[in-house]
Amino acid sequence: MKLDNGMASKTKRLRGWCFVIVAAAATNGFTTALPAAPVDAQAIADHFTSIKSMSGDFVQSGPKAERTSGRFFLQRPGKIRFNYAGQWGISVIADGKSVVVYNKKLRTSRLYSLSKTPLKLLLDNKVDLSGSRLKSIREEGDLIIIKLSDKSSFGNSNISMMFDRKNLDLRKWSLIDEKGLTTTVTIFNVKQGVRVAEGTFTIDYAANRENNTSTKSR
């Protein structure tokens, strides 16, 4: 399949944003800071992980102000799905073990281990803030920002989770890639405690192998 330069460039950028979601690895992000008043980071994390399922809309902003949007579904432990709007049929799916970035139109997919991505920190039944995982916590406007990393699992990657200061609900998160570039996902129209349709988080491993074999043979 041949794509005109404009369409090919747009598709490449979108795949890149998806890649940042699942494979971020960097060192810097927010400057470490303490809030003016004490904030219990573990209490906020426990509130977040008490929500076992949710769905809603999202807007993703890239390092060059690129924006895309879609729907997401989350179920603990370890499962999330992003369906990106647009003709390419791009989705990101975590099934508790792996994460796949899938382009339905081009029949391409990229598979990663969930345990090696910052998404794991969002999807665990409990956010573990022990050791050196908690890098900073601070207040900024109506948000409380908690920055986390886990060097033993995914190197110098980090994720900053931003919670509503009033009700402690998650509003957005930012991931940093290996070049120090930030991608932010903002969620809204969120419903908690939802029932998610069967198959939402299913990864077709056979299709993934076939897609990758076909790609290599082109």
Name each model-derived stretch.
Residues 67, 71-121, 183-184:
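An acidic-aromatic
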Residues 3-19:
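Bacterial N-terminal signal peptides that target proteins for export
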Residues 18-29:
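Bacterial N-terminal signal peptides
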Residues 106-145, 149-152:
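Flexible, surface-exposed loop/linker segments and immediately adjacent secondary-structure boundaries
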Residues 58, 80-84, 99-102, 146, ...:
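Short hydrophobic/aromatic-rich beta-strand segments that constitute the beta-sheet cores
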Residues 46-65:
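A short, Trp-centered hydrophobic/proline-enriched beta-strand micro-motif
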Residues 130-132, 139-213:
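Gly/Pro-enriched, hydrophobic low-complexity segments
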Residues 31-38:
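Boundary at the C-terminal end of the N-terminal hydrophobic targeting segment
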